[in-house]
């Protein structure tokens, strides 16, 4: 067993949020004499957001690196790749890794992320059935796109759309299957979803909504997808993009309180005062988190807490804005997408220019926004939603954006 110099910090996982925590700790001036990161992936932290750009051949793999090795040496941070923590002993305050290494800790942080959800379909174990989650997945998809022609992406959320567009850019014929009646149904209303579908089809993607697979067919290699209406789609590759679930098994085995994720308080502390969690593996109140922005906010909160910064307000989940670009079509969504009984809707659309907007207003406050095509006003709308600003003076011009409203005021 390795005896850590007290106090020692051990971090389980090295994704973007864990890396942000390390940077915040360094910037704040942490009290730890030793920081050790155990990472299940073969690579140190990289920009996971750019995986879709890598798949689409828009960036090089080297551009995904967040920090060079010299940064970790400079700040005396030890990173062990391909070595996930496999057991936590809270009473003894030590962890065991996949290699059999045992290490004592003063403070432990769980940043174990999330895993792709499976549908439990017959044939999911066939060769050619994949997920799109990490750099290893992306490398495999790039390789297969060089030797295969047809792909089916199951799931019309943002990850599925990014996978589909990346494979299309690599020259594959791609079909998107989505169970809901419109794409991005958690971020867009039906009108925006229909416009998005039309634009993707214009770019060469096949989009089937309101349908779902019942089986993946083939002997050893996947050869087709059977749909609920009996249709059979021939394919060489299937990408499952049907959501994620928090990686909580390690915490559960250690006796930590878990629900959908590892439960934490506003300081990102679990049911054990010496163990913290953040990012996709954690749950705060009823919220779990699939985007990097709240994870970065959690990293800032936890860094202040671990560095004992006074006046740390704690983590408060707000309205999370979704920003992405599919086939060069920018998309923004923040807040609710469906009007309530006391909601006023402001809506505009230019189908020919692939532009759509919806604003939801309640009691002179902007509560929700959807933008497709022209997202130049997204930062302003996002700030209005988060601040709860009275928009009475902008009511008749808010759809034209901040510069117009300021000039007209």
What residues fall within each predicted segment?
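Residue-level detector of alpha-helix initiation sites
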Residues: 16, 42, 114-116, 136, ...
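Beta1-alpha1 glycine-rich phosphate/pyrophosphate-binding loop at the start
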Residues: 2-77, 166-187
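Mid-to-C-terminal Rossmann-like scaffold of FAD/NAD(P)H-dependent oxidoreductases
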Residues: 2-8, 27, 281-379
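Rossmann-like NAD(P)H-binding beta-loop-alpha module
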Residues: 140-188, 222
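FAD-site-proximal beta/loop scaffold in flavoenzymes
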Residues: 125-147, 217-226, 231-304
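Cysteine/selenocysteine-centered motifs that mediate thiol-based redox chemistry or coordinate metal-sulfur cofactors
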Residues: 141, 319, 391-409
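A Rossmann-like FAD-binding core segment of flavoenzymes
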Residues: 34, 79-96, 103, 170-264
